Design a protein with these regions (language model features):
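Active-site core of glycosidic bond-cleaving carbohydrate-active enzymes
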Residues: 1-140
Length: 140
């Protein structure tokens, strides 16, 4: 909204909307962002990121704040790595999001440097996956 107000030359409105945006981000992060730095067995390793995650640490809980620009800049890579870790280790390369998360999943993985994981999800043919549905259920 602050961008629209700025485009219209409404400086006071733009400042008010920008302030509200920052307060909303701060409140969201205060409630849902969990930061437990220094807990990884192998710091910096892709499969063992520090415990920096959102909500209940599901793929969707981590992907949506990335997609909506809510993650503080210094935590973006770690939140993305945490989503990748869940996909690879917990979900064994399978999609675990519902309709809300899946629409942002491949886009955010690719945007954050994990296009290989997005490709894995898109091409996986074991259950549960899109490839499995295409191969097994296309005759129905």
């Amino acid at each position: 909204m602050h961008r629209f107000a700025s485009l219209q030359g409404l400086k006071a409105d733009a400042e008010e909307w920008e302030d509200l945006e920052h307060r909303m981000k701060d409140a969201f992060n205060a409630r849902f962002l969990h930061v437990k730095e220094g807990t990884s067995p192998v710091p910096g390793h892709t499969l063992y990121p520090d415990s920096i995650f959102y909500g209940n640490n599901t793929v969707t809980a981590n992907i949506l704040p990335l997609a909506f620009g809510l993650v503080p800049k210094n935590y973006i890579n770690e939140v993305a790595k945490n989503a990748v870790t869940s996909i690879i280790t917990t979900n064994k390369g399978h999609i675990s999001t519902g309709v809300i998360g899946v629409q942002w999943l491949l886009r955010e993985l690719s945007r954050r440097g994990h296009a290989n994981v997005a490709y894995l999800l898109a091409t996986n043919k074991t259950y549960p996956s899109w490839g499995y549905m295409v191969e097994k259920l296309s005759l129905i």
